[in-house]
Amino acid sequence: METIIHELDEIDLQILRIVQDNSRLTTKELAQKIHLSVTPTYERQRRLERMGYIKGYVAVLDANKMERGFMVFCNVSMKQINKQIANSFCETVAAWNEVTECYNISGDGDYLLKVCVSSMQKYQQFILEKLGEFPYISQVRSFFVMDTLKLTYGFPI
């Protein structure tokens, strides 16, 4: 069942704004920011997790320091597509560490992959040994990221 934002009150929205910006806060620190005691704050945050508003907590790593700073968006077109082929492609892509994001898209192409590797040579290896080996792909168009102009991990609430 899909939830809607109308079931949240202003305190819930405050919690979402704050943890989206800094998920490392302790419950006590979060409680101070929203002017509630610790127990109700803890219960609200856990409820937001159970309801699916908070999907998880992550550390954002520096891609360059992790030798994953060579970023490419791949527009993948399939020769044919059906449920079996789509499921197989999704399962295969999920196993590739180089792919950090994968979207089923409309328009020109069927999938958009975000690939993060250390170099052009590693990208070529990925294309030849992984993506290029998947049957039913008719075309891969690569878009190399020269600079990141905007990168956010949240959105306005």
Tell where the protein language model's regions lie, with residue ranges.
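A compositional/biophysical signature of low hydrophobicity enriched in polar/charged and small residues
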Residues: 1-157
